[in-house]
Swiss-Prot record:
<keyword id="KW-0234">DNA repair</keyword>
<feature type="compositionally biased region" description="Basic and acidic residues">
    <location>
        <begin position="258"/>
        <end position="275"/>
    </location>
</feature>
<feature type="compositionally biased region" description="Polar residues">
    <location>
        <begin position="669"/>
        <end position="679"/>
    </location>
</feature>
<keyword id="KW-0539">Nucleus</keyword>
<dbReference type="GO" id="GO:0017108">
    <property type="term" value="F:5'-flap endonuclease activity"/>
</dbReference>
<dbReference type="InterPro" id="IPR018574">
    <property type="entry name" value="Structure-sp_endonuc_su_Slx4"/>
</dbReference>
<comment type="subunit">
    <text>Forms a heterodimer with slx1.</text>
</comment>
<feature type="compositionally biased region" description="Basic residues">
    <location>
        <begin position="276"/>
        <end position="287"/>
    </location>
</feature>
<feature type="compositionally biased region" description="Basic and acidic residues">
    <location>
        <begin position="601"/>
        <end position="613"/>
    </location>
</feature>
<feature type="region of interest" description="Disordered">
    <location>
        <begin position="254"/>
        <end position="287"/>
    </location>
</feature>
<dbReference type="InterPro" id="IPR027784">
    <property type="entry name" value="Slx4_ascomycetes"/>
</dbReference>
<feature type="compositionally biased region" description="Polar residues">
    <location>
        <begin position="92"/>
        <end position="104"/>
    </location>
</feature>
<dbReference type="GO" id="GO:0006260">
    <property type="term" value="P:DNA replication"/>
</dbReference>
<comment type="similarity">
    <text>Belongs to the SLX4 family.</text>
</comment>
<protein>
    <recommendedName>
        <fullName>Structure-specific endonuclease subunit slx4</fullName>
    </recommendedName>
</protein>
<keyword id="KW-0597">Phosphoprotein</keyword>
<comment type="function">
    <text>Regulatory subunit of the slx1-slx4 structure-specific endonuclease that resolves DNA secondary structures generated during DNA repair and recombination. Has endonuclease activity towards branched DNA substrates, introducing single-strand cuts in duplex DNA close to junctions with ss-DNA.</text>
</comment>
Amino acid sequence: MASKFDNTIVIPASSPEQNWARSVSPCTPSRLFGLSPLSPSPPSLLSPSKLFDEVRLKMQNDQPSPKSPLGKVSKKATAPITTAGTPIVSEHFTQTARSGSSKAKTIRNRKSSKSQEGQNKILTGRVAKATATSKAKDTTGSKLNAGTKKTKTTSNSQDDKPTKEAETKKVVDSEGLNLEEALKRRSDWTPPKASVPAIISLDEDSPSGNCGAKTSFGYSLRDYHYSRDNSVSEAILPRKEGNPTKRRRLELVESEILQERKPLQQRQTKDAEKTRKTKAKPKKHPKTITARMTALYEPIDETEGLFVFDEELEAGEDFKKPAKPKKKTSTKQKEPDCVILSPAAATKSLNDQNFLFGTCSQLERDDSPTFFEETQKAIRLSENLTLENPALSTISTVPSTTSIVIKYTSKKSHWSEAARDFHGAVVQPEIIDMTDSPTIDTALSQLSEMNREAPKMASLVSAKPTSGIKPLTEKEIIPSCRPTADIQSTSSKPKSNKIGPDIVGKKAEPSTKKPTNQLPEMPNFNGYTDVELRKKVKSYGLKAIGRRKRLIALLDKCWQSKHGNVATSADDVETSSLAAINGTASVSTARISDTQVSEELPVRKKSDGESKAASRAGKRKVVEKPAARKDETAAKKAASPIRTSSYMVDEIEDSEEEIIPSPTRIRVQRQSSTRQTTPAIGCLPLGSKSKRPSTKNKASTFDECTLIELQSSIARAIRLQTRPKNLLTNGSCPPQLTWHEKILLYEPIILEDFATWLNTEGFALVSEDREVGVALVRTWCESQGICCTFRA
């Protein structure tokens, strides 16, 4: 007995329950249900009681302890499994232990053969229910034990089967199958396609019925598999990819379907070729000149119908869109709205076209082209008349007793400054004569009627010039680029009244006395160009200064010193030229009785003798200026004008002036340039803005000739300066620039340093003994266009 229990494994009852690992052998239908190989005919279903008869008998014979785990076969197959309470040793295990290891080897070989058989079978999953009770687990465990013990039982155990089956049937009928309640079945499943009609035979003695009675539960599962009838070929829609995918199972491809697919593909390719030809879109004809020329060299597009085949296959035969009904082409073709001409025809029509230039509002009008042509002809005709009759560019109105000469003048502006050529001369615009137009005649007639009604205003008579008055020449009248022009008169009593939109006239009352002496009229130097002003200054024997304003002032003084004083007057101010020179001025409320009509003399070059005499007279007037200014202060204090003047006479000095004068100052200076009596007169009426007093410096003590000589000495001294040598630095520092080099480099000149250098070193180079101040140096720099500044 000792040898009997040497290899026995004892498991005490108090030990915890152990979960033994299950076998990993494949669970095939033949192993679970004892199925035979599949038969072609479907078996009939069996009753559940017959299926579980064998299981019940095995459970009744074994009856394992509820606490014992599943039996596990150790490496030694002869070891039986027992518990401490009830040791159960089967006869089969005892016989195998006595016989030796030969029987165990056969058992191992049987297991390996079974696993090899299951390798070629389809694996089926086993569904475990989550709500299984412990009681169901015990039943499944007993089933497995019964299955293993069935394979190991001998012929002696087979004799006891009828008795065991009967006992098991009684237990099942009393206790039930211990199965879990089945889940509720869904009613909305899609039923499988009835490929083969089910044949139901009512004959109980048929061989199929007998065969179905003998079939097991495994054969009934074959009816739930989907089986396709190969005879019925389905309409297969071609895929867009054209090739099988990677996951397609090639085992399912059948030969019959492949044979039917080939003619279908051939048919579809033929249809696609037809649609390729029919649906090829016609090329759009070029509609531009560039497209017409480049269409000849463009490559032919061969990829137009490549994607038609895929689109047709994707749509399929059953999903073709209905073709749109084609519109019937009318027999009469419509003419195109815009006919595209060839390049030659377009160029020809372009040459025949008359281009009309004008503003947008003019071009948008519906006027005929002849209107524009007539307008252009009228403009050309007026230009030709202006060139032929330059004397018509002035308007002369002659009252009964006196005559008034009116001429065009204009104010300076940015446009007039910009209208210059490369040589600095003012660009001469074309002069359009508007004096003979009927609009001005009507305006003058209306104005004369108004003047007759007014008692204090003079009347205008016919616009015919008298023989005694010479019209202004074309050279003396230089209009600026501004569209409007001022008409100024050199009368004894001017008043500004607008005659037309572009003409301002000056009227005067008829005088009671006839003029005894006719003095020449001082020309308007504001209308001269820079070149003409320089020539005029040189004709007086003086050197021209760079600034235009100073040239005009110098010419005014020279002309007054040569021709004497011109009698001019302001509104409500009675002055006399002799009283102004002597330093006395009186103001009266009476009107000026004697008027003088000035006559313009033709401009001509003067001889050297006349120019020297004019220069001496100019020097004399300039020297007398400081003495006259002292007497002016007393005259200004005594003056009490009744009405404020529309302009003021401003004396132009050589002293320091504003860099950017105000607009009022510019307007006053322009108006006073033609109305100055003497350089000594300076009327400052009430209500006008006071002028900033100019500071006196060294420059005011020099006369014009001295100033010109000093300025020429400054220019010569700058050019004679040599660059100083840097002996101590040995060339490490950059060389010091001369004043001339600084000027060329546009470097700002410090006026104090420059004046100091001139007084110490510069004038010594040109043998000049006099000295200059900062104001004179600044005047010279500004006249030459040199950038200068004071020391900060």
